[in-house]
Amino acid sequence: MFRGAVRSYGERLGYVYAEEKGALGARNVLFGDPEKADYLVTAHYDTCARLPFPNFITPCNVGIYLLYQIVVALLFCVPVLVAVWLAARLTESPLAVLLTGYGCLILLAWLLLCGPANRHNANDNTSGVILVLELMGTLPTELREKVCSVLFDLEEAGLIGSASYRSRHKKAVRRQLVLNADCIGDGDELLLIPSKTLRKKQPGRLERWKTLCAGSGEKTVTVRDRGVCLFPSDQANFPLGVGIAAFRSSKRFGLYCARIHTPKDTVCEEKNVTLVRDVLAGIIREQA
């Protein structure tokens, strides 16, 4: 249903629709020529599983991010340990205890990756999909051939869709700038996070982007081209990848992204989408 609606939207605008199959049943959606384009504007369209805790990301504070991941992993161990303890009390078979432990691990992994879909996903990643579609609708006709818009599948399962895309278009992606929007809807601090390769090889381009990001009112759009900045999403699969995301700010954690993967993911600010759309249009236009 989703792919059909997106196809109708794109074809009404004059784009050619295509699908590419990838690993584990991934189906990436494309508008434009993936071999000739200079830019890929991307977002993932798959829906994450509903979890009892958010995916808490602190891009500029790796210590807090890793600590949170460790705590979550330990919480996952609790039901496994309880199940193993009960099995040990109810049976004297070491094999039964071992199978119980492995069974619980497999079940928890399945729930994490393939469990009931989170019906509230305004930020992750309805916001990114809207951005891609908005840019398609507003990009001047003369710039369209420079851009291939791609909606990746199976990002939540481990960047599967984008990895499949990269494998299929190995030569083209070496030179293409990949602008990947993920979770841009909730927060006043919007970051463009370029890859290490892009920082090293094209610092002048990043400096020009900073002028495009200036003057955004109460919201800020920043090119984060110095220091550690971690945001796990599809841009990580590309040498010239740029992650684009929105964050809130606190004195305790610095910039952070929360609520996603839970029923509380209900915020997607239109202004965020508009700001990012205009910045990306400027980036594409500067090379015209």
How would you name each of these model-derived features?
Residues 1-36, 50-88:
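A non-catalytic alpha/beta surface segment that caps or lines the substrate-entry region
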Residues 2-12, 24-27, 84-89, 93-203, ...:
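Acidic/histidine-rich catalytic neighborhood of metal-dependent amide-processing enzymes
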Residues 38-43:
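Short beta-strand element of the alpha/beta-hydrolase
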Residues 44-47, 100-103, 183-184, 246-252:
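Short glycine-enriched loops at secondary-structure junctions
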Residues 46-49, 157:
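Short acidic, S/G/P-rich loop/turn micro-motifs used as interaction or catalytic elements
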Residues 59-66, 120-124, 268-272:
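Short alpha-helix boundary/capping segments
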Residues 187-288:
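Active-site-adjacent substrate-binding region
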